[in-house]
Swiss-Prot record:
Family: Belongs to the protein kinase superfamily. Ser/Thr protein kinase family.
EC number: 2.7.11.1
Function: Involved in the pollen tube perception of the female signal by binding an unidentified female attractant. May be involved in the regulation of root hairs development.
Top EC category: transferase
Regions of compositional bias (Polar residues) in chain numbering: 296-311
UniProt topology in membrane: Single-pass type I membrane protein
Cited Pfam families: LRR_1, LRRNT_2, PK_Tyr_Ser-Thr
Segments for region (Disordered): 247-314
Protein name: Protein MALE DISCOVERER 2
High-level lineage: Eukaryota, Viridiplantae, Streptophyta, Embryophyta, Tracheophyta
Length: 678
């Protein structure tokens, strides 16, 4: 007994030592967050009330914290009126990708340690009381894409410092909706990509880049005119005065007087080697005295001969300058108009006239964002007072409806019934979802055909195509549904591949947020229709929600990546050819189950027993593609374009054959009207 009592403490400490590494990551992350909490002097809304030592093992449930696989990926405390200083210890969050602290009252400077983030992509410090200089260490952040600093109190030489930072990411310094030169520079360096504004991500218009280049081109063109060379002396002087890189200097003691033909204005500051001109009024050339009026009967003198020659030249140069300015301005204006028209025609959805038959009321309004806005009353009639429920999900319900033309629709309505529960962030996510879905427009996709938003009574809805034959999951695993033969399954595989290829090929690429057999619906002729979750807002909007699982598929703040869809497509093909669930308690994941057959090339053993026939050549190619799609390293996986091309070489199903043979009426009308509009 004594021996046991003697060894027990050592055994106890051994257990603790083994468990320590498991919580080390959480402890280090929690310590960094608690040090940030200690620097917050005022928390009027109690946002950080659940940030405490006792809950350090549950830090993924702390307000504003979003985790993926137990690692802090996002810290979003925007708009909580927090006061204090920024904690340099946040740089210890090595997996942090987004740090959003905008619209608070943080003071002091930006810690130089923020340049040591390894994976940080977004640093948003807008509308605080930060001051001092931007630390040059921020240039060390190789992964930083968006740096937002407007609405602070940085020193005047901030622009000089920020120029030294890398121009591979976008910088936002001003509140003005106009882009600052630095922001424009950043955008041009990124091939006119997306720049970050105060409230949203906006597309930099190509017109601005064209105007930027026209200025330099027109300047070189005008140098051919002598009058322009005379007038540019004062213009250059003013430009130099406005450059922030020219530091203030005292006026030179013996500043040369300007040429007689140029009138300069006094300026309170000077620029480097160009002294400011003071007391300009005293340096103006004397006015030409008036010519006395001639006596009656006497011949009028030739006034032009009495005027100085330089006055003639001055008037002439002014007239030439005026004509040149008008000509150049007209030319630039014409180019801007042409560029705007070209840009709008390229970026915007083609203008389509209202449907001519079968639709009434709001459905006949012109398109605004690619889809029409509908009335609740019209949808209520179509869905029989919202009594025809297809399915209820976590956060939204899907109803079936029929329009007056006979077209069947599916209406997804959020479960939130009061406007006070619908936050601003939810509204932004809702509109972003509409914008995203409205741009896909593929015949193997469950397309968005309308939306409804009203506040009295409150509702937010999306209207989709209706696929009457249920989901692929039901046909593969429910014995009561109709059996799918080998040809039907191959058509579903190809239709799905073409749809994902289209989504990944968009600009910017769009990846499916949760790709699986339950998100693939079938039409009357068993063509595949890929659907997207309309209201998946909880993970984005609930700061206490812990996000787990595959980062690429479940995180909404961090957009999904196409490589994750490629992996899911490989799992889907296994599910289609084998008829087995993607996960089962019996055999685990379908990948583990299939690995032994894929390694030994014993492919026939994987075939669904309910299939009477199958094509061995197609099966071999499918299994080759599956091996590529399921590779652990994302970079080694093929693109969906390569996947579709490889499958198409053996499976003779073109995109036209993979689409529904009987398109819904609204698709047919849309195609007719599109051809008429063009």
């Amino acid at each position: 007994m004594m021996g046991c009592g003697f060894h027990f403490p050592w055994f106890f400490f051994l257990i603790i030592g083994l468990q320590a590494p498991l919580s080390l990551s959480l402890t280090s992350q929690g310590s960094a967050l608690l040090k940030f909490r200690a620097r917050v002097n005022s928390d009027p809304h109690g946002t950080l009330a659940n940030w405490n030592v006792s809950g350090i093992n549950d830090l993924c449930y702390w307000s504003g914290v979003t985790c993926v696989d137990g690692k802090v990926q996002i810290l979003d405390l925007s708009g909580y009126s927090l006061e204090g200083t920024l904690a340099p210890e946040l740089s210890q969050l090595s997996d942090l990708r987004s740090l959003i602290l905008s619209r608070n009252h943080f003071s002091g400077g930006i810690p130089k340690e923020y340049g040591s983030f390894e994976n940080l992509e977004v640093l948003d410090l807008r509308e605080n009381d930060l001051s001092g200089q931007i630390p040059p260490e921020l240039s060390n952040g190789l992964s930083l894409k968006h740096l937002l600093l407007s609405g602070n109190k940085f020193s005047d030489d901030m622009r000089i410092k920020i120029v030294r930072l890398q121009s591979s990411y976008e910088v936002r310094l001003k509140k003005s909706p106009k882009l600052s030169p630095l922001a424009v520079l950043g955008c041009i360096n990124r091939k006119l990509g997306h720049c970050v504004s105060r409230n949203r991500i906006i597309q930099v218009k190509k017109v601005e880049a064209i105007v930027f280049r026209i200025k330099a081109t027109s300047r070189r063109f005008l140098k051919a005119f002598p009058s322009f060379l005379e007038e540019t002396d004062i213009y250059k002087r003013r430009e130099l005065l406005e450059e922030t890189s020219n530091l203030a200097a005292e006026p030179a003691p013996s500043a040369p007087s300007p040429s007689p033909g140029i009138i300069t204005e006094a300026s309170p500051r000077s620029s480097g080697s160009f002294p400011a001109v003071t007391n300009a009024k005293k340096r103006r050339p004397p006015l030409v005295p008036p010519v006395p009026s001639p006596d009656k009967g006497s011949t009028s003198p030739d006034i032009s001969k009495n005027q100085p020659q330089d006055n003639k030249q001055s008037k002439g140069s002014k007239h030439v300058w005026l004509y040149v300015v008008i000509a150049v301005a007209s030319f630039v204006g014409l180019l801007i108009i042409v560029a705007v028209i070209f840009f709008c025609r390229k970026r915007a959805v083609k203008s389509i006239g209202p449907w001519k038959t079968g639709l009434s009321g709001q459905l006949q309004k012109a398109f605004v964002t690619g889809v029409p806005k509908l009335n609740r009353s019209e949808l209520e009639t179509a869905c029989e007072d919202f009594s025809n429920i297809i399915e209820t999900f976590d956060g939204y319900t899907v109803y079936k409806g029929t329009l007056s033309s006979g077209v069947e629709i599916a209406v997804a309505s959020t479960a939130i019934a009061e406007s006070k529960e619908w936050t601003r962030a939810m509204e932004m996510a809702y509109r972003r979802k509409i914008d995203t879905l409205s741009r896909i427009n593929h015949k193997n996709f469950v397309n968005l055909i309308g939306y409804c938003e009203e506040d009295d009574p409150f509702n937010r809805m999306m209207v989709f195509e209706y696929a009457p034959n249920g989901t692929l999951f039901e046909h593969l695993h429910d014995k009561e549904t109709e059996h799918l033969d080998w040809s039907a399954r191959m058509r579903i595989i190809m239709g799905t591949a073409y749809c994902l290829q289209h989504m990944h090929g968009m600009n910017p690429p769009m990846a499916h947020t949760d790709f699986n057999s339950s998100e693939i619906y079938l039409t009357d002729d068993y063509a595949a229709k890929v659907s997207e979750i309309p209201f998946n807002l909880e993970a984005r909007l609930n700061p206490k929600k812990h996000v787990s699982g595959d980062l690429e598929q479940t995180s909404l703040l961090l957009p999904p990546e196409p490589e994750a869809n490629v992996h899911s497509f490989g799992v889907l093909m296994l599910e289609i050819i084998s008829g087995k669930l993607s996960f089962s308690d019996e055999y685990g994941s379908i990948e583990q189950w299939a690995s032994k057959y894929l390694e030994k090339d014993d492919l026939g053993e994987m075939i669904d027993p309910s299939l009477k026939t199958f094509k061995e050549e197609e099966l071999e190619v499918i299994c080759d593609v599956i091996r590529e799609c399921l590779k652990t390293e994302q970079r080694q996986r093929p693109s969906m374009k390569d996947v579709a091309e490889q499958l198409k070489q053996v499976i003779n199903i073109t995109p036209e054959k993979a689409t529904p043979r009987s398109s819904p009426l609204w698709w047919a009308e849309l195609e007719i009207l599109s051809s008429e509009a063009t």
